[in-house]
Amino acid sequence: MSAEVSHAASQILASGSERDPSYNDFSFIPFLRNSFGFGLACDVPVCKAYSEGHCPLGPACPDRHPTPSRVTTSTTTASGLAPSTTHGSLVCKHFLKGLCKKGLKCEYLHEYNLRRMPECQSFSRSGYCPNGDDCLYQHVREQARLPPCEHYDRGFCPLGPLCAKRHVRRRLCQYYLAGFCPEGKGCADAHARWIENLPKPSIRVEKTEEELERERILIREEQEREKEREREWRSERGRGGGFMRGRFRGRGRGL
């Protein structure tokens, strides 16, 4: 047996050709390509007839038929690179685990970008995530959830760091302050909105560490009670128990 394995290995090494890590060997790839247009190369052009409204070839068309949800709205990603495919706004979950077999042909984004990842549910509920820094989802701090301060956006907030709202540090556009900015909405600086009768800013109420710890304990206790109720409910179902079990006794004959 070992001689056969050694002979097969020597043949592979003697061939000198590496196997192309393509995923076209799967039997269901032609069905996905013909039915949904998945797996097409990045350089395949978009069908002009389909873009105008109708393609007579339908699924048999060799060009791409992108749906509105799959069309990329920007030409670059957050890292400054061009999106690899039409799904440039979503991160490939298999790529994050090192298990994506499509490579450059993948319809999703192959880069680790926290701005495009969903929010961590565990961190948002209790302020604690068991995965810590290794978590692949966003950990949004409570300070980041505060609305922006209108007074600070206009140029000055009298409360400063004591303000209950968030102070977003952005440079005001000098052209916009002078009356006109040629960049419009695409300007990198801030265009202050001069809203009259702004509400008076309020002082931020900071919680002590003891209060925050009590809130975390209450959240954990509520989660434990919820798990206990679920375990009791599942155990009742396993024993065949019900709401009216053992409480109903029908009348016998002759009564």
UniProtKB/Swiss-Prot annotation:
Comp. bias intervals (Basic and acidic residues): 221-239
- Give the taxonomic lineage as stored in the record: Eukaryota, Fungi, Dikarya, Ascomycota, Pezizomycotina
Start-end of C3H1-type zinc fingers: 41-68, 91-113, 114-142, 143-170, 172-194
Q: Name one GO cellular component term.
A: mRNA cleavage and polyadenylation specificity factor complex
Functionally, this protein is described as follows:
Component of the cleavage factor I (CF I) involved in pre-mRNA 3'-end processing.
A GO term for molecular function: zinc ion binding
Its encoding gene is what? yth1
Q: So what family is this one in?
A: Belongs to the CPSF4/YTH1 family.
| Compartment(s) where it occurs, according to its Swiss-Prot or TrEMBL record | Nucleus
Q: What name appears for this protein in its UniProt entry?
A: mRNA 3'-end-processing protein yth1
Please list the residue ranges that the record marks as compositionally biased, kind Basic residues. Answer: 246-255
Per UniProt, the keywords (alphabetical) are: Metal-binding, mRNA processing, Nucleus, Repeat, RNA-binding, Zinc, Zinc-finger
What are the start and end residues of every segment in region (Disordered)? 221-255
Q: Which GO terms describe its biological process?
A: mRNA processing
One of the Pfam families matching this protein, by short name: zf-CCCH_2
